[in-house]
């Protein structure tokens, strides 16, 4: 029984470490001190998410994010393996601006891939 408890504790520590590392890598754009934070959970293969990104996000970015009034967070919610793989590709880049440009391209070309 003690061996099982040690094993469970080790798994829990690793799991918590992973969660903490993932949380610190939120894909965001805008002022970190903005009074408003918009959190969007989306799948890169969802047509409704693409529509939001192509229409509303660009206006939101131009009017509010670029003026440091809003911080925008993109949270991955992959609905299938293709969305997960696309999200992994986005996360490989180091700069958030580049990541958001890649998100633009992925959403624009969503129907073709």
Per-segment meaning from a language model:
Residues 14-20:
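Sec-dependent N-terminal signal peptides of Gram-positive bacterial secreted proteins and lipoproteins
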Residues 1-3:
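Hydrophobic alpha-helical membrane-insertion segments
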Residues 32-50, 72-73:
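Short active-site neighborhood of thiol/selenol oxidoreductases, capturing the structured segment around
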Residues 28-30, 62:
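Short secondary-structure boundary/capping segments
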Residues 5-14:
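Sec-dependent signal peptide recognition
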């Amino acid at each position: 029984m003690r061996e099982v408890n040690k094993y469970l504790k080790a798994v829990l520590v690793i799991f918590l470490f992973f969660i903490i590392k993932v949380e610190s890598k939120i894909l965001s754009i805008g002022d970190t001190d903005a009074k408003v934070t918009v959190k969007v959970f989306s799948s890169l293969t969802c047509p409704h998410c693409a529509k939001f990104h192509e229409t509303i996000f660009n206006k939101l970015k131009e009017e509010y994010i670029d003026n440091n009034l809003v911080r925008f967070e993109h949270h991955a919610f992959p609905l299938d393996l293709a969305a997960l793989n696309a999200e992994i590709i986005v996360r490989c880049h180091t700069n958030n601006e580049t990541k958001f440009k890649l998100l633009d391209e992925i959403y624009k070309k969503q129907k073709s891939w």
